[in-house]
Amino acid sequence: MSVPVRHLIAGAFVEGLGAQRIPVSNPLDNSTLAEIACASAEQVEQAVASARETFASWKETPVSERARVMLRYQALLKEHHDELAKIVSSELGKTFEDAKGDVWRGIEVVEHACNVPSLLMGETVENVARNIDTYSITQPLGVCVGITPFNFPAMIPLWMFPLAIACGNAFILKPSEQVPLTSVRLAELFLEAGAPKGVLQVVHGGKEQVDQLLKHPQVKAVSFVGSVAVGQYVYHTGTAHNKRVQSFAGAKNHMVIMPDADKAQVISNLVGASVGAAGQRCMAISVAVLVGAAREWIPEIRDALAKVRPGPWDDSGASYGPVINPQAKARIERLIGQGVEEGAQLLLDGRGYKVEGYPDGNWVGPTLFAGVRPDMAIYREEVFGPVLCLAEVDSLEQAIRLINESPYGNGTSIFTSSGAAARTFQHHIEVGQVGINIPIPVPLPFFSFTGWKGSFYGDLHAYGKQGVRFYTETKTVTARWFDSDSVAGTNFSIQMR
């Protein structure tokens, strides 16, 4: 019998009252782990009302007390680190080591939120005019919503609600219906850390519940991570209903390999960055651009990828796990077939991959294409699977031009021993996050996650300084205190006197 997935509404864990039921499947064998009873419209309304009511008192809570909640929370997350990683592995299929990294990168954002007193500091200028001072203060927005994807069940929720709540907001989390269990456990620990009931709500469901939140007049801001189509929908629907929205969407990330790079380092980093987590990362390297003589390394890249072995999450020798569901597997295999039809050279074929003991798992083996061109579907589309494409160019300038022509701009990297080449690349590339001899340049949380172009819809990015700005409003105060009864005369201009 499957376990019902609970919602957190108004400080209580409850079962959903909506008509729709969604099974939560184990990607290793597609057995049912749990079942979601979606939230009813009345429950979503109750969650918003509870968040709004709690916000009224939470925003008045001293910032030092809010920071102490975050300090207790990060300590609990560290204490339960392995437990959380096992939940991630069970519902997503990630290897245990990868799942531990998922949890840890989320903890780093909570650690950043612990510094909220400093993050909220405003600015002051004395004597902007005679005896007049101007200063800014930072205030929370109100009820904020986070809609998170399946591929990082711990990290991405932790990108959102701890920082938003530390800034004084209340938060409604709508996790992916494919991986809801991690979010429920994160919420349990948050209450255990001393967060007031109602400051965090967890609502499960699909488009119906998302639409209700996107259009609700009491919701002030929406954070989203997911696919291009849904990301565009969330952004346009949310902004049309006067929400502040940050929407992180698709990606197609390139690694430029210069012939002067350390070959062993290149191959090792490329393999992990392309097929790690079964390629289900928005920052995965899906295209390697071989410059000049680096094209001679193709046989060694193939040999290294051929040694990669998918397997179950508790197999310490497994490099990655299954993809999320049979539909994802079918789509990846369709794109591999289309790549062959369009003329790419298939050097490794991951279709039909089998893992002993798990015949019904969503397995895709490591896949490698050479001779890939920008007009091919395997190049254009975000595959979101363990598929690496190799493109060849003659110069760094051609590599930069190739990447800049992509509609996406999430992440990119260059491997080289030349400082001049690295400087040219970072200056001219039209991508928001750049790695120099770093394959997946996801910044630590005191910087922001800064995707560009079609990878991001909005103005303010996640965590870091931009994350604080996203979850707050700035109020500027100009003040004068009179120290005598004298009146200088009526001022009819806009000058300050």
From Swiss-Prot:
Residue positions binding NAD(+): 150, 174, 177, 227, 382
KO phenotype (gene knockout): Cells lacking this gene grow slower than wild-type on valine/isoleucine medium, but grow equally well on basal medium containing glucose, isoleucine, or leucine.
Catalytic activity: 2-methyl-3-oxopropanoate + NAD(+) + CoA + H2O = propanoyl-CoA + hydrogencarbonate + NADH + H(+)
Function: Catalyzes the NAD(+)- and CoA-dependent oxidative decarboxylation of methylmalonate semialdehyde (2-methyl-3-oxopropanoate) to propionyl-CoA (propanoyl-CoA). Involved in the distal pathway of valine catabolism.
Tagged with keyword NAD: yes
Induction: Up-regulated in a medium containing valine and isoleucine. Part of the mmsAB operon, involved in valine metabolism. Positively regulated by the transcriptional regulator MmsR.
GO terms of molecular function: methylmalonate-semialdehyde dehydrogenase (acylating, NAD) activity
Subunit structure: Homodimer.
Catalytic residue list: 282
GO annotation terms (biological process): thymine catabolic process; valine catabolic process
EC code: 1.2.1.27
CDD domains membership: ALDH_F6_MMSDH (cd07085)
Pfam families xrefs: Aldedh
Name of protein: Methylmalonate-semialdehyde dehydrogenase [acylating]
Source organism, top-level taxon: Bacteria
